[in-house]
Design a protein with these regions (language model features):
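Short aromatic-glycine-(Arg/Gly/Cys) micro-motifs in beta-strand/loop hairpins
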Residues: 1-15
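Short, mixed-charge low-complexity intrinsically disordered segments
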Residues: 31-64
Length: 64
């Protein structure tokens, strides 16, 4: 499983994809910002290795 799950929370909770590194997360965020003319709120949730689930309650906003 990938380390991060990436979402756009601007209008709902759209999953953008999964990434292993923060560089990949930032690339997804840049692509989403370009596709939506900046009307997005991209966040990422880190994988909890103990449960195999993503910690959405502890998500981090991705700064572009």
């Amino acid at each position: 499983m990938k380390k991060y799950k990436v979402y756009d929370l601007y209008e709902g909770k759209e999953t953008l994809g999964y990434a292993d590194t923060m560089d990949e997360v930032k690339l997804m965020a840049r692509d989403q910002a370009e596709a939506t003319d900046g009307e997005c709120l991209v966040v990422c949730a880190e994988l909890n290795p103990d449960t195999g689930r993503y910690r959405f309650s502890e998500y981090k906003e991705v700064r572009i």
